[in-house]
Amino acid sequence: MNASRATLQDLFDQAIALHQQGELARAERLYQQVLLMEPASFAPRHMLGVIRFQQGRNAEAIDLIAAALQQNPQVAAAWVNLGNVQAAAGHPEEAAASYRKALQLEPANSQVLNALAAQLLRLGQRDEALSAIDQLLAANPGDIEARNNRGNLLRDLKRYDAALADYDALLTVRPDLAETWTNRGAVLCDLGRPEEALKSLDRALGLQPGLAVALSSRGFIQRELARFDEALESLARALAIEPDYAAAHGHRGKTLSEMGHLPESFQSFLRAGELTYAARRPGPDAFAHEQQHEQEQKDWITASGEVGQGPLHIVGGARLSGRVVNLHNRDGADKAWRESDPKIVVIDNLLTDEAVAALRRYCLGSRIWHTPYSQGYLGAFPESGFAAPLLAQVAEELSVTFKDIFATHPLRYHWAFKYDSHLDGIGIHADEAAVNVNFWITPDAANLDPDGGGLVIWDKAAPLDWGFAKFNADEKAAYDFLAKNGAKTVRIPYRANRAVIFDSNLFHKTDAIDFAEGYENRRINITMLYGRRRR
């Protein structure tokens, strides 16, 4: 079809005007009319793709914009739009590639650098995301959002001093930013400076009294300082402002747990899990072992006929009418604890058969495994719904059954890990608590190495002046310390329904895992931490 250049331009200009006014259907017709007249035209095909994106038709949008870019790959805005659609469609790797194409054409485009950083974070490429933000700040040193985001990312990378420096630099020129005062408070807490952290949060609340995130962080830090009533008051204020604020429910659960109010604590944890994870499923960019677990769990639920309850599909987990912790271990375990140095006690047949079976059913059927680790295992934490009344019953009975071990230590935190069949396990670390309880609930028949699969504990404790980041995550420092002090290991093989109870400050790691294939054969361990680490 022949048409003058002026006619085509006039039609396209009309389409753009209608598009800008939100008249998508009329704009679409004009774009299509231009394409009929000039099929090789880049601009109308690109803009049709934009309309498809606005209509939520992402697959068509990707096809249209990609086709336009084949005709003219030198338009940065089109690469940006393609990246935006790919990001919305759940394709972060493709989106990052498109944003990089745009940056080749416009290297200092702050919008694109921000978008690229966001996709790199989705991909877990935090160092690369930091590089993108650094490029943005090199071009735009005064970009407030980028500076704040850089601080947040440095905190995620556990580079706390650098994060604090970014927040301080930003607050020097913009002391009115309540969010940044809040972030500063969080990183000061990470650095073990809770009193300074509270002052920073108070600055945030002075600027914005209804800032729920600051109130929630304030409650978290007050709990760390054992100021439990104040913590509950701060968290109540946060939840009055944002009743569905998951983090505040989680912090409330931790506070109530240390106060000894486990039923109420676990209700708060469950609410946090429902708010955060009810609709979450592994996406296309999830780890392969996470996707495999999702499918295996679906198949198990279908085959077993289990009907889950609530948004997290909780299977079982109710309190049992009788005891769950066996009494026959009591005197021997307490005596062993009193006499052992270092404090390490192994208890076999910890729980009743009924309790073990109920816990296995709960762990197999409930959708609570929401924290994947690249090494090949999944975590279930209280805030993701790992808060069954049966777990509270176990925690309570442990305290009253083994009084010499637990003394007055309350339950501080708990979690579970579920592993792939063949792994090295979790690396060396110590935990932020007084007493560590680690028990296992997968049948012995699943363990292909009866002499392994359990726990390795060193007979030397982490130095008391080491901070959490060092004793919990710095493996090199731990091994150097142990070698220097001639530490020896205690290797405890895996056994179903075996508990290892030990001083949480002792360095330990999961032994190498060699379990049979199959969903029900996955190694599951449950950890409960009691009390606070010595200072």
PLM regions and their residue ranges:
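Fe(II)/2-oxoglutarate oxygenase catalytic core
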Residues: 258-499, 505-535
